[in-house]
Amino acid sequence: MEPSKLFTISDNATFAPGPVINVADKKTFRTCFRILVLSVQAVTLILVIVNLGELVRMINDQGLSNQLSSITDKIRESANMIASAVGVMNQVIHGVTVSLPLQIEGNQNQLLSTLATICTSKKQVSNCSTNIPLVNDLRFINGINKFIIEDYATHDFSIGHPLNMPSFIPTATSPNGCTRIPSFSLGKTHWCYTHNVINANCKDHTSSNQYVSMGILVQTASGYPMFKTLKIQYLSDGLNRKSCSIATVPDGCAMYCYISTQLETDDYAGSSPPTQKLTLLFYNDTVTERTISPSGLEGNWATLVPGVGSGIYFENKLIFPAYGGVLPNSTLGVKSAREFFRPVNPYNPCSGPQQDLDQRALRSYFPSYFSNRRVQSAFLVCAWNQILVTNCELVVPSNNQTLMGAEGRVLLINNRLLYYQRSTSWWPYELLYEISFTFTNSGQSSVNMSWIPIYSFTRPGSGNCSGENVCPTACVSGVYLDPWPLTPYSHQSGINRNFYFTGALLNSSTTRVNPTLYVSALNNLKVLAPYGTQGLFASYTTTTCFQDTGDASVYCVYIMELASNIVGEFQILPVLTRLTIT
């Protein structure tokens, strides 16, 4: 780079042009500059101090002081108002979410108790339309359809000996008689029960009658509950009702059945679903029965069958379990053609290529036994305020969330909906789902299913679908064994192992024998209590638990189909036990 024409560098460290300044002069200049800077800083500091003093004087001035005091008072007043408003809001929130629901429930229980007290009768004078009100004993009202255990802690259980009480379920009265397919529903005010009375052994496609009863829970002198029957209806009108499901409704019972006089396999092979019947039986002896054709039935289903297990009355709607065969080229059949659900037991998985297992799981929905129809679960939903005009619809869950359709039960516990599905296909374990409905005023309602992973025991099955099989395959097997949840299920990690339920299982992997009462967690059985002798033949079981809130005792009624060597092939027996929880 070319040197600058304005500056040249000399050996004596001076710069040109301009006068030459020696080192001593430079030091003097630096000293003067520093003194000047310090002086400016000192003057600035003095000015700041003076201004602060003036500000203090102004603050101490009476006028400004009064203004500041007024502002402070207003701020304090506003703060007090805000605190008061927040307090009121907290009281409102607590009242709406805690106090009011408890008060309403208490008032409801008191009202039911008062009705039970004043609704009495004498021989000549009665102040009620019936002799005994349709109201459970007050000790049980608030312990029905509630989770017995609210926490997620670890508990131990013991099942007491069966309590001696009169059976509310009649048996067959001849060696050739047959009573089968019990369905039981316990509501807050009363209970409903039904079973099929088959006239020719247990061939339910021939001729049968339907037994229906309703009653209340009362306390015996021994201190434990008894199922007191108040009304009985025996439907003997020539209609062969099958697979009936029962539900408690206000002032009575609702029952969903289908009518058929042919084999179940023939129903699936057909193209038009059998007649669907909805029967309403009230405490004043009124019986109303209607043929229903729920939306979504015609053109989609070859057959539709009630789920046998009980339904529920929920949010002014009547909900029953159902299942059946879907026509392959129907709208529903095309929509669900590729849907399947393949649960896996992580403690005992099925080996093989995943794609192959998925294909086998899909094929399991189309068993050849049912003419290769897709066997699908569903829910019959009827608006209660339009029940006399039977405004019902079929709500169909996705097969990506459920296994092959089968018998089932809808449960309502602590305002939470659960669905039991019989393990009729290849999956051998108990099938229980949490469910939630989305109802619409117009258009199709929907339901979401959330599977609860249970691996504690298996049901008996035949052929390739025994209790030991865990791999997908097409079959129709298993048996109806519904459970009763004792605790709410939580999806939160780490606490699901303390989900408990009880029921009656059949302790065999291949044969319907050895009825056994149990309490179970998700992955292991906690208690086993065999009923009867080893090898006793049995079939369907349904379980309901409730609590005596007077002394906190927990009772469960296990209704079981047991073999009978005296009257008929089966005797339906309600086994009442006390469940101890520690």
Curated annotation (Swiss-Prot):
Keywords: Disulfide bond, Glycoprotein, Hemagglutinin, Host cell membrane, Host membrane, Host-virus interaction, Hydrolase, Membrane, Signal-anchor, Transmembrane, Transmembrane helix, Viral attachment to host cell, Viral envelope protein, Virion, Virus entry into host cell. GO terms for molecular function: exo-alpha-sialidase activity; host cell surface receptor binding. The chain crosses the membrane at residues 35-55. It comes from the Viruses. Glycans are attached at N284, N329, N400, N448, N507. It catalyses: Hydrolysis of alpha-(2->3)-, alpha-(2->6)-, alpha-(2->8)- glycosidic linkages of terminal sialic acid residues in oligosaccharides, glycoproteins, glycolipids, colominic acid and synthetic substrates. GO terms for cellular component: host cell plasma membrane; membrane; viral envelope; virion membrane. Its EC number is 3.2.1.18. This is Hemagglutinin-neuraminidase. GO terms for biological process: symbiont entry into host cell; virion attachment to host cell. It is a single-pass type II membrane protein. It is an enzyme of class 3 (hydrolase). The gene is HN.
